[in-house]
């Protein structure tokens, strides 16, 4: 009777031991190595899983950062602090990534670009596009039905009373969801500090563009002529700014006859001032000034800036090695 119990138990025990050894061997043979830095990087990421980095989520981004196929500042949500934390884990330098925010490159409000028809349907820009490109008179303009607002996971977008989306730069993480969702391609990411922006996406010729919107770019080229830094070109009948070259001197804003380039000339513009006690009269500022607004003699400080001629481009500020120049806003709100 006792043998009838012990024999099956012994057999089961032997089989259990054999299977256990087999599983242990299989675990070693088929083990998938995970770099110990992956969970550390994952913990440093914000965990939004928004896909703004171009990957399915934060887990995938962490693995790609450690694997070397993604930059340490690839997360648009975490910003500089997240990049610094990841850089510390990876033993690298974070660098200085420029924060970007979503911007609407359209000024076609209900008044400046009226509708050509009434739209009855789902309040979604993508669905409205099916009906002959939407109800807007300008076929390139914002429809204003709030698809960008609906897809924003951070509540950074609201639809204003004028029918155009308004982006809160404090909430925007530059994840790019709104850019992907906009059927008119008028949502774009620009550097947060960039105020001078062409707010038009109309590719029609000037006369036609003017008929559909009173603030449309007419490709007149006035901005191109005004820019001293070759930062503006006209492509497909619409002005385009190279933000890497733009000095935000507001000359293009002042010259645009259609007011389609954003920027507050009165309050946004700055003027350069010499800090006399720091000036060593090296002449770098005068040499690089594009309008010859700075005069003086080498080794005879201080140099003098003609504030009426200064366009506020800030080149002298960047070139000065002695912190002898500061940029002061012309007006403060």
Curated annotation (Swiss-Prot):
Binding site for [4Fe-4S] cluster 4: 217, 220, 223, 227
Molecular function, one GO term: 4 iron, 4 sulfur cluster binding
Domain 4Fe-4S ferredoxin-type, first and last residues per copy: 126-162, 163-192, 207-237, 239-266, 270-299, 301-330
Amino acids binding [4Fe-4S] cluster 2: 138, 142, 148, 182
Keyword Nucleotide-binding: no
Note accompanying the cofactor annotation: Binds 7 [4Fe-4S] clusters.
GO cellular component: plasma membrane
Coiled coil: none
Annotated residues for binding of [4Fe-4S] cluster 3: 152, 172, 175, 178
Source organism superkingdom: Bacteria
Binding of [4Fe-4S] cluster 5, residues: 246, 249, 252, 256
Presence of keyword Translocase: yes
Stored PROSITE patterns: 4FE4S (PS51656), 4FE4S_FER_1 (PS00198), 4FE4S_FER_2 (PS51379)
Residues annotated for [4Fe-4S] cluster 6 binding in this entry: 279, 282, 285, 289
Enzyme class: translocase
Catalyzed reactions: 2 reduced [2Fe-2S]-[ferredoxin] + Na(+)(in) + NAD(+) + H(+) = 2 oxidized [2Fe-2S]-[ferredoxin] + Na(+)(out) + NADH
Disulfide-bond pairs as recorded: none
Entry's family note: Belongs to the 4Fe4S bacterial-type ferredoxin family. RnfB subfamily.
Stated role: Part of a membrane-bound complex that couples electron transfer with translocation of ions across the membrane. Couples electron transfer from reduced ferredoxin to NAD(+) with electrogenic movement of Na(+) out of the cell. Involved in caffeate respiration.
UniProt-recorded name of the protein: Na(+)-translocating ferredoxin:NAD(+) oxidoreductase complex subunit B
